[in-house]
Amino acid sequence: YHYLTGKNVADNQRLRFMTGDYYKLINEDNRRVTVGLNGMWWHYQKDLSGYTLGQGGYYSPQTYLSLAIPVNYRQRTDNWSWELGGSVSVSHSATSSRARYPLQNLLNNSIQPIPDRYEPDDGGSSNGVGYTLRALIERRLSSHWTLGAGVDIQQAKDYTPSHALIYLRYSMAGWQGSLDMPPQPLVPYSDFK
């Protein structure tokens, strides 16, 4: 549960529930194959996805449901580690009609009348299918240096946050043991938690 607040934006409440499980088809020290099933449910008290004064401009459906089936293959050797994976998902979302200007006190009619001040924005529902593809690879160059690369392709209607990266990591202590499986790439600042 989260209570969302902001300046000149209507307050909102959200509930989110996520669950999932996976099965290891192959579970060896240096190789692993998994398949899973993930589910998500979101509920927002208000749809504040609009961009008028008082709206939040963020995705906030009253109902969002999704199911995904992820598959991953991971392997490592003495100086290499890689992962290939992907998933396919289906989703459903629904929103109610909403006030175009949820905070009427922010509007001042004495400056300029707003003809659509009390007009609602219609809600609706939609269904979608999406997929992700991911590939990561790392190569140990020496005890201290590791070179890595990755690509993450995400595709869904109106949402495609794909990215690729190449990185060079330096370990001050040095390491000749097993590489991480899966590889641990640098995390984009936008994904940092």
Range-by-range predicted roles:
Residues 1-7, 23-25, 39-45, 63-65, ...:
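Transmembrane beta-strands of outer-membrane beta-barrel pores
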Residues 1-12, 30-66, 187-193:
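Outer-membrane beta-barrel translocator/channel fold
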Residues 3-9, 18-22, 52-60, 118-123, ...:
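Extracellular loop and loop/strand-boundary signature of outer-membrane beta-barrel proteins
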Residues 9-16, 45-54, 95-103, 160-165, ...:
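Outer-membrane beta-barrel translocator domains and adjoining extracellular loop/strand segments
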Residues 11-17, 29-31, 61-67, 78, ...:
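Residues that define the transmembrane beta-barrel architecture of outer-membrane proteins
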Residues 17-23, 39, 69-75, 86-88, ...:
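Residues on the lipid-exposed face of transmembrane beta-strands in outer-membrane beta-barrel proteins
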Residues 27-33, 79-82, 141-149, 174-179:
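Repeated loop/turn-to-beta-strand initiation elements of outer-membrane beta-barrel proteins
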Residues 160-193:
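Outer-membrane beta-barrel "beta-signal"
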